[in-house]
Curated annotation (Swiss-Prot):
This is Alpha-keto-acid decarboxylase. GO terms for biological process: aromatic amino acid family catabolic process to alcohol via Ehrlich pathway. Its EC number is 4.1.1.-. The lineage of its organism: Bacteria, Bacillati, Actinomycetota, Actinomycetes, Mycobacteriales. InterPro entries: DHS-like_NAD/FAD-binding_dom, PDC/IPDC-like, THDP-binding, Thiamin_PyroP_enz_cen_dom, Thiamin_PyroP_enz_TPP-bd_dom, TPP_enzyme_TPP-bd, TPP_PDC_IPDC, TPP_PYR_PDC_IPDC-like.
Amino acid sequence: MTAPKIEAVYTVGAYLLDRLAELGVTEIFGVPGDYTLEFLDHIVAHPTIRWVGNANELNAGYAADGYGRLRGISALVTTFGVGELSAANAIAGSYAEHVPVVHIVGAPPKDAQSTHRALHHSLGDGDFEHFIRISSEITCSQANLTTATACKEIDRVLSEVRKHKRPGYILLSTDVARFPTEPPAAPLPGHTDGTSPRALSLFIDAATKLIADKRMTVLADLLVHRLQVVKELETLLTADVVPYATLMWGKSLLDESSPNFLGIYAGAASTEAVRAAIEQAPVLVTAGVVFTDMVSGFFSQRIDPARTIDVGQYQSSVADKVFTPLEMGDALEALASILVRRGVSSPPVELPPGNPTADTPSPTQRLTQQILWDRLCAALTPGNVVLADQGTAFYGMVEHRLPRGVTFIGQPLWGSIGYTLPAALGAGLAHRNRRTVLLLGDGAAQLTIQELGSFYREGLSPVIVVVNNDGYTIERAIHGATAPYNNIARWRWTDIPGALGVANHSSFRAETYGELDEAFAVAAELKDQMVFVEVIVPKLDLPSLLTALTRPAQDSNRIFQLPNPGWDN
């Protein structure tokens, strides 16, 4: 590939790329458009950043999301109007799920905008700020760059994205992108601790009194990961014998192979043992917890505030008393120090068993959801990155314990089906040394399958499992089991990788345990190529956790008039 010729003068576009590289971005996703082409030349010529073109802008946004979850930041480039709006669903998902993505939008030159003429990719009314106003609802920071303040505004948006762990939006006109400027004079300012010493001191006093000599239990969620304070939480967990659980959103946040791991807490949909351990804990620490409908069993959690220490991003509470400003990492370190200072070791506790060991099915046994996820979990190895789409794949996997060193990615709040396929591309590029395992349903795959060829082009070798249950099974479980709107077109799935340009791959169609076992054995052996497995399961078969969750959803009143859990949080 011939690199484009770039003028020697340093530009605003180069400044933006150098700042992204400084934050750890080595790939930028997107789809080219005429308002971005010159900026793309700078990307191609950049010494450390590569361009990764996608099949469409929505997929580019999903890929950037998957990359950002593992790298801590990501970027995509789309063109004005038509391109950015195609990516808006993905950006909204990143906002909902606290993923830092920088969305760079190429726009017409400023002088053309000033004429207020009906330029292509606009609404034709001469107003070129419609879309930045839309973006303000789904990003934490926005900038319409001008030549006078471009570099300052770039730094502001990137700093806000890094601080809030949410997307940012940069509108980059073609003339501003090529405008001369100076390279960064210094690195972006790092994180400054926003904790008040007085708030921390009062928090320690209150927490010490509540904890006393009682056993502590921890319930953790995804904000611990997004705010990069996992080590601080692990220090707390090793300061004593501390049982812990996570919500579905925080799955794989902590070691699930530990004898202290309780399992997944999902309110009334939890196992009885996990529910009792969390809801009856003498002292419960909730770290980075956000109760959403689907991860809490439709808000059926029973958490008593009087026995709870809640640790949030910028504030913490002990019982009914709030302490702010107090950053999460500082609060977790303080709790660990309290356990160390008290010098009382809690006795071991009886915890629920891990994945139950069932009898190995016969090779001719027809596959079910339970057999599929049992066998898949047994095939995982440390280092795998598992992406489970928001369907039976997600709920089938979350109730299984993962090996240490496996990362799990799902999207239970935004829940945009098809998200995980392009996100797996981004995750694979974020950590090339870790093999991705992609799990999604047939209906979800039909939305984003165009990106499959990009895996081969980028030299990635994922294991892809498409669950063929002949349509939208979760919707069938909620309403309309035989309704035509829950049907989809039937595809020849094993032909698709080759049709989309994946030259080096192995495809399997598994209806029995023996066929599934063979496919996974080949996947374990062939680590340098894509292994694509179509798995046939009954149309109305559900994982047990999903069965528990869909009971309240079957009553439409429960969807919109959710029960009051009886506690404040």
